[in-house]
Amino acid sequence: MTEAEALTSRLNAVERDRKHKNIRPSDAATLLILDRTAGGPVRVLMGKRHMRHRFFPGAFVFPGGKVDPADSRVRLADDYHPQVLAKLMHEMRGPKTVARARAFGVAALRETYEEAGIFIGVPRGDAVPAAGVSFAGFAEAGVQPQLAPFRLVARAITPPNRPRRFDTRFLACWATAIAGRTPDGLGPSGELEDVAWLTFEEAKKTELPAITFTILDEVANRLSRDPALDPATPVPFYRWRGKGFERMLV
């Protein structure tokens, strides 16, 4: 069995609840913040979902969520690397615009603040408040959101006939992009009970959604071959074709 077959077979094994009315996937984004400053293996920021959630209660996840319409109108300190932008726009559903591509990164850093209390951006005491209530915290912290540190590491679309469907871009950045944190180390949304920096092996021993486990494997494999996360490196794109997942490289 090839590496690609092993990764897709795990996802296929859990996709049995497909009896719901088909819905259009919502755009979503998530962020893997990677830390290699402490020595030893790379660690990734993970959060434990609150037990009150109906969707994966108690599971460990990366910060992230749906893209909001206002995410495409946020004032940014800088832009993606051109090759990252090109990958984000590959086979984009609906209007294929740079503003929509930027919204993925903005959603990822917004959700990271809301859930984990971490600001990704450029410290600027005179930062202009960005659009949207969620970015008031950035303005108060004197941080302007930025996209330059982000690398696309995967994309996945939930199969048809699932109760919830997302077209998710998985972005990554190094912990050196962190410009600040909330005092209590948690975000204002209350969606996560706890956050922790885990090695990939530690993370895979927690309760994880299948796609999260798969992305951990994908990123671990990439780091072994591409430790600098070169923006030109092809990234996996998972989507449902016929009776199972297809994994292609973008």
What are these regions (language model features)?
Residues M1-V250:
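N-terminal leader/linker segments that precede catalytic domains of diphosphate-processing enzymes
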